[in-house]
Regions:
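Structured, soluble extracytoplasmic/luminal domains of envelope-associated proteins
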Residues: 78-128
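Solvent-exposed, acidic/flexible segments
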Residues: 37, 41, 47, 89, ...
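Sec-exported extracytoplasmic/periplasmic mature domains
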Residues: 49-56, 101, 165-172
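Short beta-edge strand/loop motif at the mouth of beta-sheet-based domains
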Residues: 52-93
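A short, structured loop/turn motif at beta-sheet edges
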Residues: 38-42, 97-104, 124-134, 169-173
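Hydrophobic small-molecule pocket/channel-lining residues, especially in calycin-type beta-barrels
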Residues: 3, 107, 172
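Hydrophobic ligand-binding cavity/cleft-lining segments
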Residues: 2, 6-68
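Beta-strand/loop substructures that line and gate deep hydrophobic ligand-binding cavities in soluble
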Residues: 109-162, 167-169
Length: 173
């Protein structure tokens, strides 16, 4: 009986400490990366503005090639919606909110695992010279308490790095 009592006190103590730590961690997150690609701004932007192409280069598609994807609307235009379901990388939805071809920018809202809270994401292509472009891919969002504790263990930046490296390989072939 004493063992059970000490065991329960220990478990409750660990849970309490974990929740206390989470209370002091940031509830916002920022992730992203950038890369230079040896292609013109126009070529790169025409490829990245199409959300259906993301499955060719994003790292999450490589983690789970069996992702179930659904698309609604006209790809590369505001309102286009991509939803996915995956046992390995989770479920979510991505909606194009703005496309600015002149500035090489596409803005998107990301919703993870049924959340109603939009995480803001964008891809931006900038011309370095007529044959080299810089691509930025970033996301900013919120993680509710106590799930913000996961921020200590997950680094999405490496997934953005890998995705942009895959994009570079595809476009520079």
């Amino acid at each position: 009986m004493k063992f059970l009592k000490y065991f329960l006190i220990t478990v409750l103590g660990i849970v309490a400490i974990t929740l206390l730590v989470a209370a002091f961690l940031p509830k916002d997150f920022h992730a992203g990366s950038e890369i230079e690609i040896n292609k013109s701004k126009a070529e790169v932007f025409e490829y990245v503005k199409l959300i259906k192409n993301q499955g060719n280069y994003d790292n999450w598609s490589r983690m789970d090639p069996n992702i179930v994807r659904n698309y609604e609307g006209t790809d590369g235009t505001p309102g286009f919606t991509y939803t996915w379901q995956s046992k390995k990388v989770g479920d979510g939805k991505q909606v194009i909110t703005a496309v600015d071809s002149a500035n090489g920018r596409i803005d998107m809202d990301l919703f993870f695992d049924g959340s109603e809270v939009a995480n803001k994401s964008f891809m931006k292509v900038t011309e370095i010279n007529p044959n080299i472009s810089k691509v930025e891919w970033k996301v900013d969002g919120k993680i509710p308490y106590p799930f913000n504790l996961m921020g200590l263990f997950f680094d999405m930046n490496k997934d953005f790095d890998a995705g942009l490296n895959h994009l570079k390989e595809i476009l520079e072939k």
